[in-house]
């Protein structure tokens, strides 16, 4: 009950904060869905519609997408991220482990248009690659970055961060 009350209060406060709405077409959304070797479920379609409505509104979004392992939460997240990228915003996709971050990164590379600027920031990246990624995020040369909690540090500055996905 206390968790519910805390989340309710957070949602109320977030709704009061104004933001720039994202304007996007359904073209990247539809192209990505057509690449899938399965059809989205009605629940996935509804989740995407709700997320897209929130993204295009003037209120901040705080949404929990829940489901069993393999239920398609990642696909829904990636498709919604593509719409944000299409609106010229950056996306940060944080996973709890480096292995999972790499899996999401590889899936995005398969699904997203080839010209999408996608990077993985990991502890296995050498110091020069990390510095390059940090600079590219700051200069909006990267549209979506995947990583662990390391993508949220003081030295990492996004040019135009518009969407954060946290996979728990």
Where are these regions (language model features)?
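Conserved RecA-like ASCE P-loop NTPase motor core of nucleic-acid helicases/translocases
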Residues: 90-97, 119
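Pre-Walker A segment
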Residues: 1-93
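Walker B catalytic acidic pair
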Residues: 148, 167-168
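Conserved catalytic network of the ASCE P-loop NTPase/AAA+ motor domain
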Residues: 57-58, 83-87, 111-113, 135-140, ...
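Walker B beta-strand of ABC/ABC-like P-loop ATPase nucleotide-binding domains
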Residues: 65, 92, 157, 165-166
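Signal for well-folded cores of large energy- and translation-related assemblies
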Residues: 33, 37, 52-56, 109, ...
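Conserved motor-coupling elements within RecA-like helicase/translocase cores
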Residues: 121-145, 152-161
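Conserved helix-turn-beta segment of the N-terminal RecA-like "Helicase ATP-binding" lobe
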Residues: 100-136
